[in-house]
Amino acid sequence: KIPVVAAGSIIDGRGLAAALAFGAVGVWVGTRFIMSTEAHAHQDAKDHMLDASIEDTIITRSYTGKPCRCIQNERIKRFEDNPDQIQKFPLQYMQTIQDDVFGTIGGKIKEINVNEDCLPSGQGIGGINDILPSKQIVDNMISQASSILTNSNNFISN
C-alpha cells in the first residue's frame, strides 16, 4: 500500500477531514502556513493576501517559467499580455531572482512590492481570514477535522 498525502486548498479541518475520508494518510498545507505569524513573508504580503479571493489569483509562468498560482499583479499582467517574453525554466526563474521580485517564495521580509513581487497562493486563499501562530493553525485543523469525522459516524449508524 502506497501512502498518499493530499494537497490543494487544504486550509482548515474540513479539508483535512475530507482528505482522510478519501484515504490520505496526511495533508500538505501551503498557503495557510504562509499566513502564519512565523512565516518568513513580509507583513504587507500577508495583509494583501488576507484581502484576496480565488478570483484574484492566476496560474502563471511569469516568475519561474513553470506554472504557479499567484495573486495577480501588474508584473504578471505585463507578462501575460506578452507571453512571448516569458522564458522557459530555469531562465525565467533566474530573471526573477535577478529582478529581486521573488517575494514570499524567496523569503523577502524587509521590503515587498505587491504589484511586482511573487505572492504564491492556493485556491483556498479566500477562506483564510486571519494570521495565526502555526501551532494554533494545526490545533484548530485537528480539532475541526476530529469533530467532523466523529460526527460523520452518526450518518452511517443512523
Which sequence ranges carry the predicted segments?
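Conserved active-site-proximal phosphate/metal-binding subdomains
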Residues: 1-5, 10-158
